[in-house]
Amino acid sequence: MSMQPPERRDIPAATVTRLPQYLRSLHTLAAGGVTSVSSDELAAASGVRSTQLRKDLSHLGSHGVRGVGYDVAHLTAELARALGVTRTWPVAIVGMGNLGRALAAYSGFAPEGFDIVAVLDHDPALVGDSVGGLSVRPMTDLPILVAEKGIGIGVLATSVAGAQSAADSLIAAGVEAILSFVPVALAVPPHVSVRRVDLATELHVLAFLRQSDSIAATTPNPTDVGRAG
């Protein structure tokens, strides 16, 4: 069940998006005292097919042990290493509106290796407020904070109008990874990674799925209609 260190770019992007869920499931299993897990069990806990899970883990060099499965502690360590969360990542949140404040107060980031070390806003009226145990800093302090605290990830929770400027400030300060909750495409250099979480888009997708289910439930089956005559 040994794993060879994977090259980051050798792992498909779709696989990378599923690895955090596997890691979260493993943490839950470990907390419950589970020391080994089959691919079927881990797949069920993660909401994927076992064939998909085995394929994803094969990109890390793991194939499990027939009849035994995966060692939970070992697989947890290897997934954490592959995802880069064997270290703690200092994170800054820009934008202290309702969403930014909620993100700053969320206690679930630290256990996953992400430490919120700075919160910022361009509005002087918000500077100095206490959010998530931190004092809101002005955007002009961003370069100093990035240098002092080693901030590597920035979270955008600004208005649409302020998103690009905030992203530019993060990049100029040396931040090369941005998680944006703003529903707008950002123009960034090739070396900067951006992930966008568009809550409205996700709601649209859910609305479409529910509407499709409703239509399917109320549309007569052509075979049944023919038989009715």
Which stretches of residues belong to each language-model region?
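Extreme N-terminal segment that seeds HTH/winged-HTH DNA-binding domains in transcriptional regulators
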Residues: 1-35
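HTH-adjacent hinge/linker in prokaryotic transcriptional regulators
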Residues: 36, 40, 44-91
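Phosphate-bearing ligand-interacting subdomains
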Residues: 22-30, 132-229
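NAD(P)-binding Rossmann-fold cofactor-contacting core
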Residues: 111-132
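Basic, low-complexity intrinsically disordered segments
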Residues: 108
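Glycine-rich Rossmann-fold phosphate-binding loop(s) that bind the pyrophosphate
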Residues: 96
